[in-house]
Amino acid sequence: MLLKGAPAADHILATIKENIRACSKAPGLAVVLIGNNPASEIYVNMKIKRATDLGMVSKSYRKPSDATLSDILALIHQLNNDENIHGILVQLPLPKHLDAQAILSTITPDKDVDGLHPVNVGKLLLGETDGFIPCTPAGIVELCKYYEIPLHGKHVVILGRSNIVGKPLAALLMQRHADTNASVTLLHSQSEHLTEITRTADILISAIGVPLFVNKEMIAEKTVIMDVGTSRIPAANPKGYILVGDVDFNNVVPVCRAITPVPGGVGPMTVAMLMRNTWESFLRHTS
């Protein structure tokens, strides 16, 4: 089974759009882009377009790659104090000279729609429900719900321990909720017996950014695979490349039970969760 993200995302976004239409005021989303990373440009434009399509007021704030930390923090403080902005997103990755954690920690937690502020991370770890959950982990859980893939009691193996996906995803999946409550194993570049462990997974989620890393030898029959990775590899086409995931798709499809495509799998869900967090932030600020 192919786990396409668009149908699940469209279902969520349609509800948000309907709710916004019923409001006299629109949610405001600020997207901060620093530098000229081509991939980041694409992601930012996609998020802004999606927000606008839903009826949100979406603004982009662009800073040059040599912007100073003080410049960025001043902008964040400005957005924190703007009553018309309900969600603030700083597009990652940042130029190397900037301290990402310092910037993310400056966003007020109740506008941190990416869910990366230490307060929201802490609430996730504690199982509290009034924080914002990082968008990709939340999107994966929603994708499982849409396709009726149970997580409760299942062994979920996560490849990758990033602060954006791996760690918060592990924390989310272990929560004592009907939609989660999984047994989680988190693997990384220093993990031993990798294949031996991945073959025990009911659900394998890869978020390492290594193209075509996961092959059929690493999974058991009827494993569900969620591929978070997106990489470019050279190809003989007009673009000169194709997008692939962490998983060797054609290699594992005959063996696995279900798999997300790249592109078109987890990606649309990440954007949908950003929109949902922005909507929820709007409700909290206007209630």
UniProtKB/Swiss-Prot annotation:
This is Bifunctional protein FolD. InterPro entries: Aminoacid_DH-like_N_sf, NAD(P)-bd_dom_sf, THF_DH/CycHdrlase, THF_DH/CycHdrlase_cat_dom, THF_DH/CycHdrlase_CS, THF_DH/CycHdrlase_NAD-bd_dom. It holds the Pfam family THF_DHG_CYH. It catalyses: (6R)-5,10-methylene-5,6,7,8-tetrahydrofolate + NADP(+) = (6R)-5,10-methenyltetrahydrofolate + NADPH; (6R)-5,10-methenyltetrahydrofolate + H2O = (6R)-10-formyltetrahydrofolate + H(+). One of its GO terms (biological process) is L-histidine biosynthetic process. NADP(+) binds at G160, R161, S162, S189, T230. Homodimer. Belongs to the tetrahydrofolate dehydrogenase/cyclohydrolase family. GO terms for molecular function: methenyltetrahydrofolate cyclohydrolase activity; methylenetetrahydrofolate dehydrogenase (NADP+) activity. It comes from Chlamydia trachomatis serovar D (strain ATCC VR-885 / DSM 19411 / UW-3/Cx). Catalyzes the oxidation of 5,10-methylenetetrahydrofolate to 5,10-methenyltetrahydrofolate and then the hydrolysis of 5,10-methenyltetrahydrofolate to 10-formyltetrahydrofolate. Gene3D superfamilies: Leucine Dehydrogenase, chain A, domain 1, NAD(P)-binding Rossmann-like Domain. Keywords: Amino-acid biosynthesis, Histidine biosynthesis, Hydrolase, Methionine biosynthesis, Multifunctional enzyme, NADP, One-carbon metabolism, Oxidoreductase, Purine biosynthesis. HAMAP family: THF_DHG_CYH. GO terms for cellular component: cytosol. Its EC number is 1.5.1.5, 3.5.4.9. Pathway: One-carbon metabolism; tetrahydrofolate interconversion.
